[in-house]
């Protein structure tokens, strides 16, 4: 099996689920199309990643799993922060609010593809300026969409509740992926 991602969290989830995966990241243009909604974007990107890697690297019968995760607050995409100031801006925006984490997943095997989008609602506690500054100072938010990692030592303390799949917020709804793999 090929995992078309270099995300350490996705690699770990696939290996913990018992899959022996080759890691081959896709190199595609991830720019959103004009008027493309966040959920359409993640599904399109997952499909493009899976197709690109399958075309170049997959052996006969070998599945390719690709995923793309975004954080959206009131329709605004929150990607990985550009710098610490950007991380603070995102965390202030998320403070006390519910946002969505969406992961698009695509599995390609022998030319056929199955894709889906999983959406989880995440609600943050009200965060103080000091809490945000302290969290940003850990460095933990800097490589994560929305400037937080729910699985992180500190990021987990920001989240009041979730409605949906915890592992989707981590970066891969692994139970749904396993079920989809059994169908393809």
Please place each PLM-identified region on the residue numbering.
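Cofactor-binding loop segments of dinucleotide-utilizing enzymes, especially the Rossmann-like FAD-
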Residues: 6, 26, 110
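Anionic-ligand binding patches
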Residues: 2, 15, 38-184
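Short glycine-rich, Thr/Ser-proximal phosphate-binding strand/loop in the N-terminal lobe
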Residues: 18-36, 113-119
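N-terminal beta1-alpha1 ligand-phosphate binding loop
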Residues: 1-19
